[in-house]
Design a protein with these regions (language model features):
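A short, aliphatic-rich alpha-helical micro-motif
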Residues: 42-44, 66, 141
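Short gly/ser/thr-rich secondary-structure transition/capping motifs
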Residues: 27-34, 52-54, 125-134
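General small-molecule cofactor/ligand-binding pocket signal
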Residues: 27-31, 95, 170
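Phosphate/diphosphate ligand-binding glycine-rich loop within oxidoreductases
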Residues: 46-123, 135
Length: 171
């Protein structure tokens, strides 16, 4: 099997390619570029095209299918960036990575807390040696109503973890 990786990150993803290639007998080629009409030909001779959550237009799928690509493994939790109906019509299979729901939920909650406490602003001002308190007053999550759209594994885990904060939850 030959797989073409688009938008492969050299600082973390690339390190896995060589050992898994040898372990599973998979040949691969990669580019750091996202798929564009100008580089679709890179997938010629490949059985699979792997992407991150970058835009995949229906025309890309048509071009890849004409080259013999049958499998689209995504390096992301979801695959909403791929036109699923078009892939199905072309006989292409889509898969996606599994991530621990608790890790993703905790990351989402961390970002919520950082926004509520204006951490970005605080860090930027600290870089400029500005430690004044003006405009740094955050919001208390316990007094907030938090809505979660999508209550699959990750959404349910977010709700469960947020329940300890005492905020009102909507799902």
């Amino acid at each position: 099997m030959m797989i073409r990786f688009y938008a492969l990150r050299p600082f973390d993803e690339q390190a896995y390619c060589e050992p898994y290639s040898k372990q599973y007998g998979i040949d691969y080629a990669y580019t750091a570029e996202v798929p564009t009409p100008d580089n679709l030909e890179l997938a010629k001779g490949c059985d699979a095209v792997s992407t991150n959550p970058c835009l995949i237009a229906p025309e890309y799928l048509e071009a890849w299918a004409a080259m013999g690509v049958k499998f689209l493994p995504c390096r992301s939790i979801g695959y909403d960036h791929i036109p699923q109906q078009k892939a199905k019509e072309l006989g292409m299979r889509i898969s996606h990575s599994w991530y621990p729901p608790a890790g993703v939920a905790d990351y989402a909650i961390m970002l919520m807390l950082m926004c509520n406490r204006k951490v970005g602003q605080i860090l930027r001002r600290a870089d400029a040696q500005d430690y004044s308190l003006n405009g740094k007053m955050g919001r208390d999550i316990t007094r907030m109503t938090v809505g979660v759209i999508g209550t699959g594994n990750i959404g349910r885990t977010v709700l469960r973890h947020l329940s300890g904060f005492g905020c009102k939850l909507l799902a």
